[in-house]
Design a protein with these regions (language model features):
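Metal-associated gating/positioning segment near the N- to mid-region
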Residues: 57-124
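Short catalytic-loop micro-motif centered on adjacent basic/acidic residues
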Residues: 99-100, 130-133, 242-247
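Histidine/acidic residue-rich metal-binding segments in metalloenzymes
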Residues: 141-318
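A glycine-rich helix N-cap at a beta->alpha junction
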Residues: 119-135
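C-terminal cap of metal-dependent C-N hydrolases
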Residues: 333, 387-453
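Histidine-rich, glycine-flanked metal-binding segment
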Residues: 6-63, 444
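His/Asp/Glu-enriched, well-ordered alpha-helical/loop segment
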Residues: 210-231, 235-240, 290, 311-312, ...
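Divalent metal-coordination and catalytic microenvironments
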Residues: 18, 36, 58, 69, ...
Length: 457
């Protein structure tokens, strides 16, 4: 309950009696927020100076979620989603910061286009924002001339949609040159398109253009993923490059990653997208092309193996790979259906559902969704509940049930693959830079997020 609140633009907020989920511990404390920062954590008396006082009794306070992989579609693809609508959905899901991929229109293959995305986001995004610079064979020489240490990362993700052969995994010479010269995180989509095409041709011979979607994980196969990931790791080790494998999907691949050193010492990291933990190939019969992703949703064994690797620290992050398309685009036949789906509003709820099932701790959720993205991408003063850090915070009620429906889906595309699911936790408040931007279904749309900054720059 909010005891006093003049308006959401108040720069002073006291959150009382909440259970902080932070840095491997849960403890009851108060949090004092002023001028956008966490000023004090501990036992704090109510202050009679016009501050907002929020009673957090019985609720759990997480650092704001940092989603390390989204596709918010702006510029150029805004019939699917845009920085305003998708950041709003993110806030309702407790996500306070995101890093957006380069496969917009135009692709983000130059600093001019990258800077334009930052300009648009500063005007439109309610959450904090960062962007990958796209890299492929066409702009490699320009990229390696840049001081890439100032970037959050470079990536090839999604660029294969505009031109075949754009994936670094299919171009070992390009990948090797990049690894030898790039100081930034290199985040790659790890599938060998040659293997995918061979598999696709086999199924076309049998089914023509009417290949059932259930064969998607056999077309975009374990072999296609494993061989690409294994080769990328070999080259990254050779050049001591900073490699990050996006959206891992197979149990076999998890064994390629280390868990015997802390994240800060790793030069090779990986992530799992939340849908690869939630769905498996048994769901194709029910949901069809709505759960067509690249890389594909795979087997129950893979799903369980990914969760195990997340828990034992071979997998470092949980992301969404939020990729909205219209229902019309998704409901086409297999080969015409677009790959990807919207997830950013529901990712924390899914992970909290795993907590409810006894599969993961709250502390581990905070580690993989808040702390580790900040560490991996060297994001300045975010991802932790610490004095002096930006007040990006998410307050959670673990005892409220609600069902995903068209009425509460906030994505511009208007649908979700988890529609009809009943969750047993809810995000009640979300703070961004000290502003209460989401409060039990209501938004403060007067504020805008900030550009994420890296400590390397």
């Amino acid at each position: 309950m909010v005891k006093q609140q003049k308006n959401n633009m108040s720069t002073k907020t006291l959150i009382k009696n909440c259970s902080l989920v932070n840095e491997g511990q849960i403890r009851v404390a108060d949090v004092w927020i002023e001028d956008g920062l966490i000023q004090k954590i501990g036992q704090i008396e109510d202050l009679n100076d016009g501050a907002t006082v929020l009673d957090g009794t019985g609720k759990f306070l997480f650092p704001g979620i940092i989603d390390g992989q989204v596709h918010f579609r702006e510029p150029g693809l805004t019939h699917k989603g845009d920085l305003y609508t998708e950041s709003k959905a993110a806030l309702a899901g407790g996500v306070t910061s995101f890093i957006d991929m380069p496969n917009t229109s135009p692709n983000v293959l130059s600093m001019d286009i990258l800077n334009e995305k930052y300009r648009i986001a500063a005007e439109q995004s309610l959450a904090n924002f960062g962007f990958f610079l796209g890299v492929n064979g066409d702009n490699l020489d320009e990229v390696i001339k840049l001081d890439t240490s100032k970037l959050l990362g470079v990536s090839d993700d999604g660029l294969y949609f505009t031109k075949k052969g754009n994936l670094l995994a299919d171009n070992p010479e390009t990948m090797e040159k990049l690894f030898a010269n790039c100081k930034s995180v290199i985040a790659i989509h790890s599938e060998k398109e040659q293997i995918v095409e061979e598999n696709e041709n086999q199924y076309r011979e049998k089914y023509g253009e009417n290949v059932p979607v259930k064969f998607h994980p056999l077309i975009r196969s374990e072999k296609a993923c494993y061989e690409a990931t294994n080769r990328a790791i070999e080259l990254a080790n050779k050049h001591h490059a900073r490699l990050h494998i996006l959206h891992l999907t197979t149990e076999a691949e998890t064994h390629l990653f280390r868990n015997d050193i802390p994240l800060k010492e790793k030069n090779i990291t990986t992530e799992v997208s939340v849908h690869h933990l939630w769905f498996s190939d048994v769901d194709y019969e029910r949901l069809g092309t709505l759960i067509k992703w690249n890389p594909a949703i795979k087997t129950e064994k893979d799903k369980k193996g990914l969760l195990k690797a997340l828990l034992d620290d071979r997998i470092d992050l949980v992301t969404t790979d939020h990729a909205p398309h219209t229902l019309e685009e998704k409901q086409k036949p297999y080969f015409q259906s677009m790959s990807g789906a919207p997830m950013v509003q529901h990712s924390l709820n899914i992970m909290l559902e795993f907590y409810k099932q006894g599969l993961i701790s709250l502390e581990k959720i905070a580690e993989k969704m808040c702390h580790n993205p900040a560490i991996l991408y060297h994001i300045e003063k975010r991802g932790f509940i610490r004095e002096g850090y930006f007040a990006d915070l998410t307050l959670v009620d673990l005892n409220t049930n609600w069902t995903v429906s068209k009425e509460n889906i906030l994505y511009k595309c208007g649908w979700s693959p988890v529609e009809g699911t009943t969750f047993h936790s809810s995000i009640t408040q979300t703070f961004v830079n000290g502003n209460l931007v989401y409060n039990n279904g209501l938004f403060n749309e007067k504020t805008r997020g900030m550009a994420l900054t890296t400590t390397l720059g």
